[in-house]
Structure formats: C-alpha cells, structure tokens
Design a protein with these regions (language model features):
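Transmembrane alpha-helices and their extracellular/periplasmic helix-loop junctions
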Residues: 150-240
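Flexible inter-domain connectors and hinge/loop segments
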Residues: 1-179
Length: 240
C-alpha cells in the first residue's frame, strides 16, 4: 500500500498538524504514522472518507479551514489532517542510542510490546523541526513517534482528538456573553453588586472554557471575554 512520511509546516515554520491520509486520484495514501499504528493494532479496518479517516472503530475527523482559533487557508487543508497533540516532557517517547542497542545496554521492558522506530537524531542530518514548545528543534523520528503515540492513544485509550464548534455556534457563544455583560450592567445599579456579578460571570465563562479544554473541546475564550468587557464598558459609559 502506498504511503508517505511528509510533514506539514505552518507558515511560521512550526509543526502543529499531522497529515494522516489523502487521495491521489482514487488511490488512498496513508501516512507513516497511520500505517505503523495499523500494523501495531493488527487490523485491516482502515478507510478514507470525505471528512474523516476510520481506523478500526475510531474516527479521525478532518481539520477544517475554520476549526476553532487555528485558522487555515483553503490551500492548506488538503487531505485528512489532525492537530498534533504533543505529550508532556515526562511522557515523551524514550530514546535509545545505536550503541546502547548493540551492547544490550537497556531494559528489554522498554521495547517489549512497544512500537520501535529507528532513525537519525544527529543535527548533521538536518531532519529537525520546530514544535509549538519552542526551544531546540525536534528530530523527525521523534515527531513520527509522537504521531504514532497520539493515534494509538486515540484508538486504545479512547483519548478524544480536539473537537471544534461550528463557526455559527462560536458567533452565538460570543454574542450571548456580550449581551450578558450588557444586561448585567443595565439592570444592576449598586456598584458592589455590579462588581461581584461581573466577577462571578467572568469566572463562570473561564470555568466553562476550562472544562471544554480538559474535554478536548475548543471553545473561544478570549473573544467571549473581550465581548463581555466591551459591552460592559460601553453600557457603563452610556449610563454615566
């Protein structure tokens, strides 16, 4: 089966997306990370649909041009793409040097029933990429390991991919909080009660967005807060 190991860099040179599949004519092509995951899962259930890729019983929804705060041009959304979910440093893939493997200088449990990817990490190979965390660039083989890990976590641990609200519902969300601030300021005249009400409302907004974040749901936080503050300030200025 045909495949590829290309990375998609954003226009600022940072690697945030994983292109897992696309069609060349009628022929589906799958990424290295997706094919490795398929072999590890020992499944033949892999297919490309117009808006998603299905691996076994897990659906990988396609990243759209207007998905959340991560905006793309139409030319950047070809194929099936997902946002890369980099692990925290203490859960990053373990690395073994060539000499460690040759000399047996490692714990066999590190590789038992695990995916092992062999590649270069030397800077001289110029296979280095910038991640959203900044700092030193990351070798391509480590990026591939991140990609495989994310796919397997999604399938085996049912860890959800990032989900996004439709654009119209994001507008409604921002409008509701903007109007909420206006109503509070218009109806409440006592300064202390007004201040407490606005603080509680802001905390409620941030808490809802945080719960969404923990559930891998992108909810526009900053625009809603700005809308709340803007209408609050406008009504206060009007009343004074």
């Amino acid at each position: 089966r045909g495949g590829f190991n290309n990375f998609l860099l954003d226009r600022d040179g940072i690697l945030r997306r994983n292109l897992i599949a696309f069609k060349l004519g009628k022929q589906p092509l799958y990424s290295f990370s997706l094919q490795i995951s398929k072999v590890y899962l020992d499944t033949e259930e892999l297919s490309v649909k117009p808006d998603f890729v299905q691996l076994d019983s897990t659906v990988f929804a396609d990243l759209k041009a207007d998905s959340g705060g991560y905006q793309l041009s139409q030319t950047d959304v070809g194929g099936t793409q997902i946002l890369l979910d980099y692990p925290v440093p203490n859960k990053a893939p373990r690395k073994l040097s060539f000499s460690q493997v040759i000399n047996g200088d490692y714990n066999p449990r590190l590789i038992k029933n695990q995916v092992v990817i062999v590649g270069y990490t030397a800077p001289s190979k110029k296979d280095l990429f910038q991640t959203p965390f900044g700092g030193a660039k990351t070798p391509g083989v480590v990026i591939h390991a991140h990609m495989v890990s994310q796919i397997l976590r999604t399938v085996l641990a049912q860890k959800p991919l990032w989900r996004f609200l439709p654009q119209w519902s994001e507008f409604v969300w921002i409008w509701v909080w903007s109007m909420g601030g206006a109503v509070i300021v218009w109806r409440i005249r006592h300064p202390l009660v007004l201040g407490v009400s606005l603080i509680v409302t802001s905390i409620g907004l941030i808490s809802l967005c945080w719960v969404g974040f923990l559930s891998s749901i992108w909810i526009p936080t900053t625009p809603a807060i700005l809308g709340l503050l803007s209408t609050t300030g406008a009504i206060l200025a009007y009343k004074t």
